[in-house]
A protein has these predicted regions:
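Soluble metallo-hydrolase cores and metallopeptidase-like ectodomains found primarily
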Residues: 61-67, 71-82, 86-88, 138-216, ...
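Second-shell loop/turn segments in exported
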Residues: 11-19, 100-104, 150-152, 177, ...
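His/Asp/Glu-rich mid-to-C-terminal helical/loop segments that flank catalytic regions of hydrolases
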Residues: 231, 343-407
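Metal-dependent peptidase/peptidase-like ectodomains
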Residues: 198, 247-346
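Alpha-helical metal-binding/catalytic segments enriched in His/Glu/Asp
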Residues: 32-33, 103, 115, 189, ...
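Noncatalytic luminal/extracellular "stalk/propeptide" segments of secretory-pathway proteins
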Residues: 1-98
């Protein structure tokens, strides 16, 4: 398999719910079929929005912005309130204000707090004041964040403009939004190599990008990893089958993996383990494993890495990727990644391009991941306990907004 061709064939923005995302899904399905592996596409609903009008005024002067899709339509006007923290005292000052935050998005509890405090709208910031570009990413107000509360108008501005608003002491802000919201569709690509047992290991990686990114590192690299493992194990006799899931819409809140575990819930008891790949194969960066399962699996990964001479930093926890919905449904899960850092391989921006990828390192990563997968696929019995530890369950509750994280 020519790994470079995978990146060249998907070297464009392919964000959730777009025709470009579907184009990549169909490409991945075709790659599986070229390897002689049966593959199919499963669609699922995603909330979408077409922005028809978006205007932001600061003391009468227009400021460039990108309105969040799915945040509703209308107008909001009020005093600008810069809120760098999310503590109770800061939240209390949001009443009747247009809130400017230091971040690019908002979690469930902070959003709920702002609505209850009486905030009129929320402004977020994107980018770096020292970068030559003045990019502004298009994001969405997630249904999981809104919950049962009302929608607040939300918009993203560039970090340089955010600094100017605060530096100039802007008083009044007005945000005007018109958009058409509708139900769209995203897709998972599923492929399967059968085993001797009626049980399988699920391997996952998301293929969607954010709205400014070509998504080479995050996460066509993980998809290339799945295809590489598939190629190496397709003709081998395995005790456990291998189910490959290329997830759509991960960047909007793990929507693809959530849709998969919901659609296949009855089958999950036959899923012995989830192996998730999210960002591998860069020139630089530390290879890590985050285990959402018993601590013994983390130790096993460290021992195996030492045995074969492949450095891995392994720990238990909950990873912000498609392993999380599996762990939440009781399937032991591990996410692997090579963390290069924003100075070397930035993500969620225009700089996530294939030139940050090392095909040589990617092949080495795939070799280790294939060996790890094959060991578990040929286990007489998968040794990983199906019981998710209590500390991991607590972290899952916090990550999935069922419990407020202790401050």
């Amino acid at each position: 398999m020519n790994l470079k061709n995978i990146f060249e064939s998907t070297d464009f923005v392919h964000a959730s719910g777009t025709k470009e995302e579907l184009q990549v899904a169909e490409y991945l399905k075709g790659q599986c079929e070229e390897l002689g592996v049966k593959a199919w596409i499963e669609g699922f609903r995603v909330a979408m929005g077409d922005i028809e009008e978006a205007h932001l005024y600061a003391d009468g002067s227009q400021v460039k912005c990108r309105v969040f899709t799915c945040c509703g339509s209308g107008a909001a006007e009020g005093e600008l309130y810069y809120m760098p923290g999310i503590d109770k005292v800061s939240i209390a000052g949001a009443k009747d204000k247009i809130v400017l935050m230091d971040v690019g998005g908002v979690g469930f509890f902070t959003y709920q707090d702002l609505v209850k405090a009486g905030a009129k709208a929320i402004l977020f910031q994107y980018g770096n004041v020292h970068y030559p570009d003045k990019d502004i990413e298009q994001r969405d107000l997630r249904e999981a964040v809104v919950g049962e509360e009302k929608k607040l108008l939300c918009a993203m501005i560039n970090a340089a403009d955010a600094v100017e608003l605060v530096k100039n002491g802007v008083k009044n802000v007005r945000l005007e939004v018109a958009q058409k919201e509708y139900d769209g569709e995203s897709h998972n690509v599923v492929a399967e190599i059968p085993g001797e047992r009626d049980e399988y290991i699920v391997l996952s990686a998301h293929y969607d990008s954010t709205t400014l990114s070509h998504g080479a590192y995050d996460n066509m690299s993980g998809c290339a990893g799945l295809l590489g493992i598939m190629e190496k194990l397709r003709d081998k006799k395995l005790n456990y089958g291998l189910r490959f899931v290329f997830c759509g819409s991960e960047e909007r809140g793990l929507l693809g993996s959530k849709a998969y575990v919901k659609a296949h819930e009855e089958e999950l008891e036959k899923s012995a383990l989830n192996i998730n790949l999210d960002m591998i194969g860069t020139y630089m960066g530390k290879f890590i494993a985050c285990v959402s399962a018993e601590n013994k699996l983390s130790h096993y990964i460290s021992y195996m890495a030492a045995e074969v001479g492949f450095p891995v930093s392994s720990k238990t926890g909950v990873y912000s990727s498609d392993s999380t919905p599996f762990a939440d449904k009781g399937v032991p899960a591990v996410s692997f990644a090579r963390i290069a850092g924003g100075n070397v391989a930035p993500i969620h921006c225009r700089y996530d391009l294939m030139d940050v990828m090392s095909m040589e390192q990617l092949e080495k990563d795939i070799e280790f991941l294939t060996l790890f997968t094959e060991r578990f696929a040929n286990a007489v019995v998968c040794p990983v306990s199906r019981e998710i530890p209590e500390d991991i369950k607590k972290q899952l509750d916090e990550y999935l907004f069922r419990k407020r994280k202790e401050q």
